[in-house]
Amino acid sequence: PICDDIINENISGVILFSKNVLTSVMEKKYTPKNIISPNQLKKLIKQIKKLSPNKLFIAIDEEGGQISRLPSSLGFNATTLSHKQLGEKNDTKLTYKEAKKIAETLNDLGINVNFAPCIDLAINKESPIIYKKERSFSDKPQIVAKHAQAYIQAHNKYKILTVAKHF
């Protein structure tokens, strides 16, 4: 279906997921996984790009830490420290280095949009989505801002668009 939409509906982008997405609750149908291995994903992205006469946005949600669609268990080299770990070390050069590793991997695969960094503040210690998954650099806005800036700069070097979230 996505191929038809790219060709016939002139959509301008896709987002890649490593998990099956429920498409029909009633029938319990799921999409097939679209991230299996580095070679498979690179080939898939090339095929998708050939379908459109326009430059497509090929997006992923690759923050690092627990939020990784490109895990080392599938052969990818993008796995990095979590935002929380980076914020605790409070070394923006390290954050840049870790984000650069992600950006290099995305660039190599042909991905040009990353739904990251997460710029939420770690103020709710009970949050199962942000705090418990270590997705925030800190509970202090200044720390979050300077690490987010380093993260974004690393992606800019590879012309990977970033989407700061969930504020």
Located regions from the model:
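Histidine/acidic residue-rich metal-binding segments in metalloenzymes
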Residues: 146, 154
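Extended, charged catalytic domains and RNA/DNA-binding interfaces, predominantly
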Residues: 109, 156-161, 165
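Enzymes and membrane/adaptor proteins characterized by extended Gly/Ser/Thr/Asp/Glu-rich
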Residues: 9-10, 15-144, 166
